Regions:
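Membrane-embedded, hydrophobic transmembrane alpha-helices
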Residues: 1-56, 358, 362-414, 443-451, ...
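Active-site lumenal/periplasmic loops and adjacent helix-entry segments of GT-C-fold
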Residues: 52-266, 546, 569
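Signature aromatic-anchored transmembrane alpha helix within multi-pass, membrane-resident enzymes
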Residues: 303, 350-363, 421-428, 492-523
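Membrane-helix boundary/interfacial segments in multi-pass membrane proteins
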Residues: 14-18, 82-87, 111-113, 132-133, ...
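Membrane-interface alpha helices of multi-pass inner-membrane proteins
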Residues: 248-251, 304-316
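Extracytoplasmic
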Residues: 510, 520-682
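Start-transfer (signal-anchor) and selected internal transmembrane alpha helices
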Residues: 16-74, 163, 167-188, 294, ...
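Hydrophobic/aromatic-rich transmembrane helices and adjacent perimembrane loops
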Residues: 145-148, 324, 465-492
Length: 682
């Protein structure tokens, strides 16, 4: 998916090929042929192409993936509507790209520009839609469940392998199942579990109140676990966000950070494979020609592939580029310390050169995006607010304590047998799985601490300054912690000789599994009674039209079926996260101005947005037909939509006579009065 999808995007973005179904299929076939050729070349050179003895494992992992995919797909069918939260944006992006033969597509909420956001995640959904000849109405939901399945299987596969590598020689009898148990735990921790907020506020505190005879005031609402700091207790000057994958998968958004989960987990797994290979090769040979030596350092396949993925992250979710550049850098540095046997100058020289190599290649491959993208970042500032200690303890106490316990366990075990105590000797003594788990855990702790120190400035300064920074950093911290805990718990239970560590690990496992109750609570709250098959609604993401916009549904569906390309369809603009822009979001057809706060974030040009908002009002309410015609010409408007939202916003000021005089009515609903005017072009 990454290779064929990204290659297709590059060819379209540099205007070599159009973004059509035929191109998606053609590129995929070409990549398939190339893989077949490479396969035969490798066979001729005696290179193993299939992992010997692993086909049964691969088959089982594919079955596991399919099972998790079916589970989430079944659940999604109880609430498939792409309406609410960020869904209008996510679905609208997909519809806009389905209509477009160029990328970036025309911005559905800013018709005079193209999409100025990290649209890579929605692009991959559209790529798969065009590749398979499917419809966005269905693939919107299939993509969210597809990602959820990857979010389970990738951690499972990585942690299972790490545990098997670490317990090599100890897996006799029933212990042979431990790697799989660790993998399942990691998959659960990353994609299904909640956090300790659920345990405290859904289980423990209500039980205490019940014992005290205090009546329960409110039931537990699953988004509370993601809106805690700044909300309980209320602090209007520091509202924050700390979401995690299970919440995202239940809610059903297809936002940048969600889709990229499948790519970041792949990158983490690849980094482990690289570190394992480096350790197997042993120290770098002393005597090498300088040119050969540096070419070897710069052209390592794993580093090159990591660079391409990091570059891709700038387009799928820029925050992940920064986060995983640091993670990749940490892995490279540790690997170089071992490869060059603690020789500081050589370690620093190679690490710096490889870092430059990674940055250079990552920026090069994504130039078709960055050259057309205006950043939303306005700098970095010191955090003026900080989380309460007990809030951090509730949200992050479990993974941090287990990570610290793992680090202490690993270090104390290895330090006892070291004759020469140095960083190199210590790292050399630690096994690759232990070392990699420590790196993941330390990176995750850093991601939790950063929002307590600094934040990235954007438009959310008043009361929400830390929100976006905390959201994007701790989302990845949760993923890294999940894999660290999945590995660390079983590693300490089996290997540690200290009873207290085994006890604490067991307690940690119990608490972690307790947080899985969040999944059940969230599913019941959001999807309803999923045991009643009769309430299954299917996967059509647009069923909300008849439910929530019955007066406009038939008109919107007429546009979807009859309008080709991306002509401008004017509709009333409104605030973000409301029912406004239901036309553009459902069809992908651009309007003059859409959700205000979103375009403010993407464009950061408030005067321009206010001018467009005023012009839209003039078009709908003015009695001066000539003024209206000039505005229609300025914005190249082809159709004017008059429905429920327009009547609600403009009321008696809505001038139907002028609007209908601008062209011909191509659709009219006699029951609701909704109509569409096709503007006559002068």
């Amino acid at each position: 998916i990454a290779v064929t999808g990204f290659l297709t995007w590059i060819l379209v973005a540099v205007e070599i090929l159009p973004f059509t179904a035929a191109v998606c299929v053609g590129v995929s076939v070409a990549v398939g042929i190339l893989c077949a050729v490479l396969f035969h070349v490798q066979l001729k050179h005696g290179i193993e192409c299939y992992p010997s003895g692993k086909m049964q494992l691969i088959f089982r992992e594919e079955l596991l993936f399919f099972g998790i995919f079916l589970l989430w797909t079944y659940l999604a069918g109880f609430r498939p509507q792409a309406y609410g939260t960020e869904k209008f944006m996510d679905y609208g992006f997909m519809e806009a790209m389905m209509r477009s033969k160029t990328l970036p597509a025309r911005d559905l909420w800013y018709s005079q520009g193209t999409i100025n956001y990290y649209y890579g995640g929605q692009y991959f959904a559209v790529f798969l839609t065009k590749l398979t000849g499917s419809r966005v109405e269905v693939t919107y939901n299939l993509m969210r469940t597809f990602v959820a399945a990857f979010a389970f299987v990738y951690p499972f596969s990585l942690v299972r392998q790490m545990t098997k590598d670490r317990l090599y020689g100890r897996l006799d009898g029933k212990k042979k199942y431990i790697p799989s148990l660790a993998g399942v735990t990691a998959g659960i921790a990353v994609s299904i579990a909640g956090n300790v907020h659920y345990i405290v506020y859904r289980c423990v505190l209500p039980l205490i109140r019940k014992i005290q005879g205090v009546a329960e005031t409110a039931s537990y609402w699953f988004p509370d676990a993601t809106r805690y700091i700044g909300y309980n207790p209320v602090n209007d000057s520091d509202k924050t966000i700390h979401e995690f994958p299970c919440y995202s998968f239940v809610l059903g958004d297809l936002h940048a950070h969600v889709v990229n989960v499948m790519f970041v987990t792949f990158l983490v797994g690849m980094l482990y494979a690289w570190m394992k290979m480096i350790r197997k090769r042993g120290p770098e040979p002393e005597k090498q020609e300088r040119s050969v030596f540096w070419l070897r350092q710069l052209l390592m396949p794993h580093i090159l592939l990591a660079s391409v993925f990091l570059g891709m992250f700038q387009w799928t979710n820029y925050w992940d580029f920064v986060i995983y550049f640091v993670v990749t850098g940490g892995v490279v540095l540790i690997a170089n310390i071992i490869r060059f046997e603690g020789k500081i100058i050589r370690i620093l020289a190679v690490t710096i050169v490889q870092a430059v190599d990674i940055i250079g290649l990552s920026y090069l491959v994504i130039l078709p995006f960055t050259l057309k993208f205006d950043t939303m970042v306005q700098g970095v500032a010191l955090a003026q607010h900080h989380s309460l200690w007990y809030q951090l303890l509730i949200l992050w106490g479990l993974p941090v304590l287990l990570t610290v316990l793992l680090i202490l366990s690993v270090i104390t075990e290895k330090m006892k047998g070291l004759k020469h105590k140095s960083l190199y000797r210590l790292l050399e003594a630690i096994t690759v799985p232990d070392l990699f788990a420590v790196i993941m855990g330390l990176c995750a702790i850093g991601l939790v601490l950063i929002p307590e120190l600094v934040y990235v400035r954007d438009i959310y300064e008043n009361g929400n300054a830390r929100a976006n920074t905390m959201f994007k950093l701790t989302y990845q911290a949760y993923i890294l912690f999940g894999m660290t805990m999945g590995y660390g718990i079983y590693r300490m239970l089996v290997i540690s000789r200290q009873k207290i560590i085994r006890i604490l690990s067991g307690v940690g496992l119990f608490v972690l599994l307790w947080t899985v109750g969040y999944f059940g609570n969230a599913v019941h709250s959001w999807f309803g009674d999923v045991w009643k098959v009769s309430e299954y609604q299917g996967l059509d993401a647009t069923t909300f039209l008849e439910q929530d916009f019955p007066q406009d549904a038939s008109a919107i569906r007429w546009l979807k079926q009859n309008i080709k390309g991306s002509p401008v369809v004017l509709e009333a603009n409104g605030d973000s996260y409301t029912g406004y822009e239901r036309v553009s979001a459902s069809t992908g057809l651009p309007t003059v101005l859409g959700w205000y706060v979103h375009e403010w974030l993407w464009r950061n040009n408030v005067p321009d947005l206010n001018e467009k908002s005023a012009d839209i009002q003039t078009i709908y309410t003015s009695t001066d037909a000539e003024t209206v015609k000039k505005l229609i010409s300025r914005y190249d408007i082809s159709y004017i939509f008059v429905g429920g939202q327009e009547k609600e916003k403009y009321g008696t000021e809505l001038n139907d006579r002028v609007l209908q005089s601008l062209g011909s009515i191509v659709f009219e609903d006699d029951m609701s009065g909704t109509y569409i005017v096709k503007v006559e072009q002068d």
